[in-house]
């Protein structure tokens, strides 16, 4: 990655049109926080709170202000760890995003889902949530599961009321899977007024998502549907589960020839950040070096030129000719992101 100090005052920000929030283009994904092994316990690792605190402090000091967690992350321990780290800072200095991650049928009842929502506030040590998401709509069996999780139990109505009361400042959803659910929720935008939507977007998924996994939808369609309605997009999987930082040698050579000083990953982060209706790009930064490299990329962001965009789309086409791309065994599919 680029050598030299990372400036603390050069972060690129995007403005959320519904609240005026100035959100850093780099968002901190809290799904894989650093851990330490606990001695003598089977599979017993615990979150390295000291390291989480250090990385959060470093991120905030360099202008990053958006943190994305969920009750489902880190075996259910991510929210607590983020609450501990962030509550050491003024509440107005960060935006916290969490989700109603009621995937298990046991959590579909109104009581269980409300308990999950209230527990998030408690773990995060906050009395309002900046960005609240319906988590992974389109997963499982599509509309049927969506209705069971959010409609039949009155949960969506409840969350809309919470937004009115100010306990939720922005309400949105993250989408994976059945496109019917995505299209349905956007068709109700006049009624629900989504403040943001979280989608998987990267230069491979832009036009090849369906080829990689037929359950997915090309990012070009998802982004365009949001941009048409001026709904800010939050980006997940900018590296496609790490695959865009671990590419074939010939792709590495191709990227390095263009930008010898920049990391392979930085191309993917610049790609995601170049789109004007993107509010923030989430990166799961387990290690300080991930954080530093991404801060280099986004302090400030140098958007891709049209010519560089074409170069990346050609790179994606090239990558699709190599059938070894598909799975990096990141286990994401097993934990309902």
Model-based region annotation:
Residues 335-337:
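Conserved small/polar residues in nucleotide/adenosyl-binding loops
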Residues 16, 28, 67, 82, ...:
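Conserved, mostly hydrophobic/aromatic
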Residues 137-332:
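Beta/alpha (TIM)-barrel catalytic core signal, keyed to glycine-rich beta->alpha loops juxtaposed to Asp/Glu
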Residues 112-133, 161-165:
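CE4/NodB-like, metal-dependent polysaccharide N-deacetylase domain
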Residues 1-94, 127, 158, 164:
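N-terminal binding-site loop/beta-alpha segment at the start of enzyme catalytic domains
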Residues 92-105, 134, 199-201:
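A short, structured active-site edge motif that brings together acidic residues
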Residues 45-59, 109-123, 179-186, 264-269:
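Short, acidic/polar
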Residues 32-49, 100-111, 254-259:
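Active-site mouth loops of central-metabolism enzymes
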């Amino acid at each position: 990655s680029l050598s030299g100090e990372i400036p603390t005052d050069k972060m690129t920000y995007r403005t959320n049109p519904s609240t005026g929030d100035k959100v850093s283009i780099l968002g901190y994904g809290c799904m894989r926080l650093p851990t330490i092994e606990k001695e003598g316990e089977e599979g017993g690792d615990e979150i390295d709170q000291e390291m989480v605190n250090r990385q959060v402090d470093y991120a905030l000091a360099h202008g990053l202000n958006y943190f994305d967690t969920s009750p489902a992350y880190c075996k259910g321990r991510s929210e607590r760890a983020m609450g501990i780290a962030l509550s050491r800072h003024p509440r107005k200095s960060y935006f916290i995003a969490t989700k109603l991650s009621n995937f298990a049928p046991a959590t579909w009842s109104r009581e269980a889902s409300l308990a999950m929502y209230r527990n998030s506030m408690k773990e995060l040590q906050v009395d309002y949530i900046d960005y609240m998401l319906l988590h992974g709509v389109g997963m499982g069996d599509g509309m049927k599961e969506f209705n069971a999780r959010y409609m039949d139990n009155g949960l969506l109505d409840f969350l809309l009321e919470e937004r009115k009361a100010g306990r939720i400042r922005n309400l949105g959803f993250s989408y994976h899977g059945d496109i019917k659910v995505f299209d349905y929720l956007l068709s109700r935008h006049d009624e629900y007024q989504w403040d943001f939507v979280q989608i998987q977007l990267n230069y491979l998924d832009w036009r090849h998502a369906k080829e990689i996994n037929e359950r997915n939808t090309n990012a070009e369609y998802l982004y365009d549907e949001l941009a048409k309605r001026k709904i800010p997009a939050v980006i997940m999987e900018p590296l496609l589960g790490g695959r865009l930082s671990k590419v074939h040698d010939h792709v590495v050579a191709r990227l390095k020839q263009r930008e010898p000083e920049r990391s392979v990953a930085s191309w993917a982060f610049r790609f995601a950040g170049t789109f004007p209706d993107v509010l923030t790009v989430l990166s799961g930064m387990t290690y300080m070096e991930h954080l530093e490299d991404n801060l280099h990329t986004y302090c400030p962001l140098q958007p891709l030129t049209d010519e560089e965009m074409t170069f990346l789309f050609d790179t994606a086409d090239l990558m699709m000719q190599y059938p070894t791309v598909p799975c990096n065994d990141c286990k994401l599919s097993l934990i309902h992101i």
